[in-house]
């Protein structure tokens, strides 16, 4: 029994019909998904927070963000962005270097100016002004305007300078209101009663009221454009600025009579009184520099204005008031000397650059015309008369300063000279003998002025001559000159000192005065 049991344990029994197959493990089955570290609620909160942050950043940096600053015009930025070329100072590469001991010829002392120095594009590039488009469209038959891409500039500083100039003119005109030859009233009366222009049926025109106004023109929106000009290389530059003058009392009132000379002279007389006031003026002012020799046949010759006559009279008022019999035509002589100088410069072939200014045709000039016609039965503010006067004023203005007509003014010589050197009235000489400049003696309106001259013969005028006559700041010299018994020169335009004149500087010891 024991032997059979052990044999059965050692040898297992398998039925013949049963087969054992090996177990195969399939490794391609998907693994169970990993559990997320955040729950659905936490993910929703994180997503909403990120969206809020993106919206806040967009609002802060794109909507409420500051605009980028404009490109600086400082020296450091210019040096890095716009490098300058010093071709004039650089040595020439195609010619041998000149020795220091070599004496150059007279024609080679002044270094040549590049031909592109007056070119419009070269000037705009060197001044960092963008006024020319990249691809301009051609236009034939008339000058082409290149609209400026530069930002319009404010003219606040220019308004202040113009206001000071106009205020000085108004004050000078008021100071000279009683002068028989130098006042604006005399100039206007002479202009209105010119026998060559006044019709025969109009009697003598009498100016009854003049108002130079109290307000000042306001300039704004200045821009520089390039204009094609066949007479200049690369065209020419033109400055456009808007000007506006309103709410001012600029007016002129006159009285005259209409004469009926048929069938006999002065058969009937009709009194007429007119008052013209400028209500508002606005337009676009064009300013450009015109070379004289190239545009002499295209530009208009400057016409003398009352301001020119007044300025000439201011310069010569001392000589006119002291000796009217000796020099009755002082302003005319001064104007003749100026014209002779201009003719001399043109004869010598010296190019003289002029300033040309005009207004565009889209200007606005509003006038107020008041009229009174008749002696007994008077007609007041006749509409037809106002229409005729406005049309005449508009025609006068357009014939002079509206495109294509321009006013040409020659630029003065601003080269510093000792004959034109002065001292402000608020300053005094620190020492008695420190001044080497010859200062003229300013006299009272009843005597002639001594002309100071550095050889040129031009008389020097005092600073701020419109404030208190002509002796502001020079009273010490005048009185000391009178105390020394100096003899004043009666020929103020000769430029030299005549007689035994004695001058003393302020602060010096007085000389011995001989009593007679």
Curated annotation (Swiss-Prot):
Stated family: Belongs to the MMM1 family.
GO molecular function: lipid binding
N-terminal signal peptide: none
Stretches the record annotates as Disordered: 70-118, 295-349, 420-466, 485-516
Function: Component of the ERMES/MDM complex, which serves as a molecular tether to connect the endoplasmic reticulum (ER) and mitochondria. Components of this complex are involved in the control of mitochondrial shape and protein biogenesis, and function in nonvesicular lipid trafficking between the ER and mitochondria. The MDM12-MMM1 subcomplex functions in the major beta-barrel assembly pathway that is responsible for biogenesis of all outer membrane beta-barrel proteins, and acts in a late step after the SAM complex.
Cellular localisation: Endoplasmic reticulum membrane
Listed Pfam families: MMM1
Transmembrane segments: 44-64
Domain statement: The SMP-LTD domain is a barrel-like domain that can bind various types of glycerophospholipids in its interior and mediate their transfer between two adjacent bilayers.
Species in which this protein is naturally found: Paracoccidioides brasiliensis (strain Pb18)
PANTHER family associated with the record: SMP-LTD DOMAIN-CONTAINING PROTEIN, TEX2 PROTEIN-RELATED
Protein keywords: Endoplasmic reticulum, Lipid transport, Lipid-binding, Membrane, Transmembrane, Transmembrane helix, Transport
Sequence ranges assigned to domain SMP-LTD in this UniProt record: 151-412
Subunit structure: Homodimer. Component of the ER-mitochondria encounter structure (ERMES) or MDM complex, composed of MMM1, MDM10, MDM12 and MDM34. A MMM1 homodimer associates with one molecule of MDM12 on each side in a pairwise head-to-tail manner, and the SMP-LTD domains of MMM1 and MDM12 generate a continuous hydrophobic tunnel for phospholipid trafficking.
Topology feature Lumenal, residues: 1-43
One GO-annotated biological process of the protein: mitochondrion-endoplasmic reticulum membrane tethering
Protein name: Maintenance of mitochondrial morphology protein 1
Membrane topology per record: Single-pass type I membrane protein
PROSITE patterns xrefs: SMP
Cytoplasmic side: 65-516
Biased composition (Polar residues): 74-96, 105-118, 295-312
Extent of Gly residues compositional bias: 449-460
């Amino acid at each position: 029994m024991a032997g059979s049991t052990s044999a059965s344990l050692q040898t297992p029994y398998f039925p013949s019909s049963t087969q054992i197959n090996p177990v195969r493990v399939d490794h391609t089955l998907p693994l169970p998904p990993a559990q997320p570290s955040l729950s659905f609620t936490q993910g929703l909160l994180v997503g909403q927070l990120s969206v809020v942050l993106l919206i806040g950043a967009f609002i802060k940096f794109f909507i409420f963000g500051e605009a980028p600053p404009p490109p600086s015009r400082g020296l450091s930025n210019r040096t890095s962005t716009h490098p300058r070329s010093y071709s004039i100072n650089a040595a020439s590469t195609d010619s041998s270097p000149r020795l220091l001991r070599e004496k150059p010829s007279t024609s080679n002392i002044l270094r040549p100016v590049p031909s592109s120095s007056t070119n419009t594009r070269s000037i705009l590039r060197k001044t960092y002004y963008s006024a020319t488009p990249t691809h301009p469209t051609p236009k034939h038959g008339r000058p082409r305007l290149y609209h400026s891409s530069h930002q319009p500039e404010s003219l606040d500083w220019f308004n202040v300078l113009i206001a000071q100039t106009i205020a000085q003119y108004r004050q000078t005109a008021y100071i000279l209101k009683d002068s028989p030859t130098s006042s604006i009233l005399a100039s206007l009366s002479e202009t209105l009663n010119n026998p060559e222009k006044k019709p025969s049926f109009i009697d003598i025109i009498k100016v009854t009221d003049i108002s130079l106004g109290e307000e000042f023109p306001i300039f704004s929106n200045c821009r520089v454009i390039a204009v094609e000009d066949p007479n200049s290389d690369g065209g020419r530059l033109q400055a456009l600025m808007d000007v506006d003058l309103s709410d001012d009392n600029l007016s002129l009132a006159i009285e005259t009579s209409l004469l009926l000379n048929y069938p006999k002279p002065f058969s009937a007389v009709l009194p007429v009184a007119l008052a013209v006031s400028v209500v508002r003026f606005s337009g676009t002012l064009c300013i450009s520099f015109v070379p004289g020799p190239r545009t002499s046949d295209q530009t208009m010759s400057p016409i003398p204005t009352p301001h020119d006559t007044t300025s000439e009279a201011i310069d010569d008022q001392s000589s006119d008031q002291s000796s009217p019999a000796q020099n009755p035509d002082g302003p005319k002589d001064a104007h003749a000397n100026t014209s002779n100088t201009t003719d001399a410069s043109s004869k010598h072939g010296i190019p003289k650059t002029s300033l040309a200014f005009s207004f565009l045709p889209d200007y606005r000039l509003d006038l107020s015309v008041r009229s009174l016609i008749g002696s007994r039965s008077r007609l007041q503010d006749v509409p037809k008369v106002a229409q005729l006067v406005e049309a005449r004023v508009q025609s006068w203005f357009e014939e002079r300063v509206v495109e294509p007509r321009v006013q040409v003014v020659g630029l003065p010589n601003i080269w510093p000279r000792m004959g034109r050197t002065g001292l402000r009235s608020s300053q005094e000489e620190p020492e008695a003998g420190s001044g080497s400049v010859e200062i003229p003696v300013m006299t009272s309106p009843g005597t002639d002025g001594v002309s100071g001259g550095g050889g040129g013969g031009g008389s020097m005028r005092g600073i701020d001559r419109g404030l208190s006559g002509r002796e502001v700041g020079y009273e010490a010299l005048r009185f000391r000159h009178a105390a020394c018994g100096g003899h004043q020169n009666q020929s103020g335009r000769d430029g030299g000192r005549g007689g035994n004149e004695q001058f003393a500087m302020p602060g010096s010891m007085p000389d011995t005065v001989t009593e007679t």
